[in-house]
Each structure stands twice: as C-alpha cells, then as structure tokens.
Amino acid sequence: MHGFLNINKPQAMTSFDVIKKLKKVLPRKYKLGHLGTLDPMAEGVLPVAVGCGTRIIPFVEDETKEYIATMTLGASSDTQDAWGVITYHTPRKIEPAQVEKVLALFRGKSRQVPPMYSAVHHEGKRLYELARQGLEVERKAREIEIFELELLNADWEQELPQLSLRVSCSRGTYIRTLCHDIGQELGCGAYLSSLRRSRSGCFKIEEAVSLDYIIEKRENLSRALLPLDYPINNLPLISLKSAELPAIINGRQISRTGKLASPRVRLYTPEGQLLAIAEANNYNEDTVLQPCRVFKINE
C-alpha cells in the first residue's frame, strides 16, 4: 500500500493529529508523512504520503499552494489570527480602491518575517514555545512569492469589515502574516479570520476526502489511495528494458541514445510499474540516467 491520500483536514486538528489517526488504520510497517503543515485553525487540502510515497516528498514539497482566506479589518491579534488575543483599533474608513492598491504591493517576490506563533526554530526552540513564555525575538525575513492575490469579496456592512482573498503562493508563505501585513499597509490593522487550503500542487480540494471517511472502513483507505506517481506525473516517463532493471535497482546509471529536455524523469518497469526517479544528464548525443530514488514497492 504505497501512494498518497488527499485529506480534507478539519479545523481544530493539527497536521500531526491527522497522521496519528491514520496510523491507527494502517499496518505499522507503512511510514506516513504530510506535504506542508496546516495550522489547527486552518482546514482543507493536506496531502499525506503513504509507504514509498514518503520518499517522493522532497520532490514535490515545493509545489505552489492555494488558499481561500478571510481577514478582518480594524483589529489585530497576537497570533495574527482569530485564535489569539484581539486588540481593537480606532475605526478608520477604508476605500475599496485603496484595498486593491495595497494588494498589488504584495504580489510577486518579497521577504516575509515569520510570526512568533510558528514552528520556525530559534536557537534550538520553536518560536511558538518562546511566544507562550511571553518572549519575542528577532526573526530573519524569508523570501516568498505571491503568484496570485485576488479579492473575492468585501463585506463593508459589518462593524469590522471583512475581505475574502484567494492566494496562490510559494512554500513557506504565512497567510496569517500576509493578512497582518496588509492591515498594516491599510493603516487599520487586520487578522486572519478563516483559512482553507484549496490546492497543494496537484492535490485539489474538490477531490479531497474526509478523515472520517478513511477511518470508518479499511476498504475506504484503498479507494482513496492515489497512485505513487500521482504528484510526479509532470515528469517525462521512460519505460525500461528488462536488461536495464538490475542497474537501476542497484542505483547504477544507464545510458540512452538521444537528449532529454527535462533534468528529472520517471523510470518504469516493462510491466508499467514505477521503479525510480532519475536525474537526466545530457552528454553529446546521449543521456545518462542516474537514479536518485529507487522504490521497492513489493516489500
């Protein structure tokens, strides 16, 4: 049983909580891992790697993430979200045109300071551990990229206006911090009210299954399990000859005539089973394929 599960994580549960619950319905020999932590207050797509799928994580964890976020204007939070201590600001009228102007400032590459309530390490401790002790330390800004930032809806009728955003961004982007920083630019303060991850790479919310569905019946796990090659289908596929199998299985390179445009490929057995991921290096008119992950999926 090797592959991926596209879990729709509920609120009030950590990403590790999801892993712990799945471990109860899987044989112990299968490793589990997730692609990208979701905060407890967030819901939505949490891809979980099963068995040999955990060995594919390094190749896909940098994929683009998409979120639907609601932010509240006119207040701030010590955690930058609705679960923290809220401080209300002096009411200030915000014009819709001003919002669009500010959003434009955050599109593209920028540097973002991670929040104190985060799992980032500082001198051997997680930042949230220090924050719970009432400490605040200087954090290094990290480069992020916002590919798309779209205003979906604005509710100006409430005492504290709310904005709904669609955010497509790089790995490591804190949506809480994005909302906080937008509030700072608007001059009114803001915090994240709700968050849903709608996509993580090729994993989409429309195809996600609930954790309860998986736990309810063992056969549901098999139904929901996506193939091992699901998140790497964008890589070129090469079908190996029987004579080439021993070399790949033992981590040795092979040569193929002709050049490849992609630096990385998928290698399959003659029967169509994924065997390895390989680095493709062109030399003259040939390509050398060096396996960097070999899957022993029959174990």
Curated annotation (Swiss-Prot):
<dbReference type="GO" id="GO:0160148">
    <property type="term" value="F:tRNA pseudouridine(55) synthase activity"/>
</dbReference>
<comment type="similarity">
    <text>Belongs to the pseudouridine synthase TruB family. Type 1 subfamily.</text>
</comment>
<comment type="function">
    <text>Responsible for synthesis of pseudouridine from uracil-55 in the psi GC loop of transfer RNAs.</text>
</comment>
<dbReference type="InterPro" id="IPR002501">
    <property type="entry name" value="PsdUridine_synth_N"/>
</dbReference>
<dbReference type="Pfam" id="PF16198">
    <property type="entry name" value="TruB_C_2"/>
</dbReference>
<dbReference type="GO" id="GO:0003723">
    <property type="term" value="F:RNA binding"/>
</dbReference>
<keyword id="KW-0819">tRNA processing</keyword>
<dbReference type="InterPro" id="IPR020103">
    <property type="entry name" value="PsdUridine_synth_cat_dom_sf"/>
</dbReference>
<dbReference type="InterPro" id="IPR014780">
    <property type="entry name" value="tRNA_psdUridine_synth_TruB"/>
</dbReference>
<dbReference type="InterPro" id="IPR032819">
    <property type="entry name" value="TruB_C"/>
</dbReference>
<protein>
    <recommendedName>
        <fullName>tRNA pseudouridine synthase B</fullName>
        <ecNumber>5.4.99.25</ecNumber>
    </recommendedName>
</protein>
<dbReference type="GO" id="GO:1990481">
    <property type="term" value="P:mRNA pseudouridine synthesis"/>
</dbReference>
<keyword id="KW-0413">Isomerase</keyword>
<feature type="active site" description="Nucleophile">
    <location>
        <position position="39"/>
    </location>
</feature>
<dbReference type="Pfam" id="PF01509">
    <property type="entry name" value="TruB_N"/>
</dbReference>
<dbReference type="GO" id="GO:0031119">
    <property type="term" value="P:tRNA pseudouridine synthesis"/>
</dbReference>
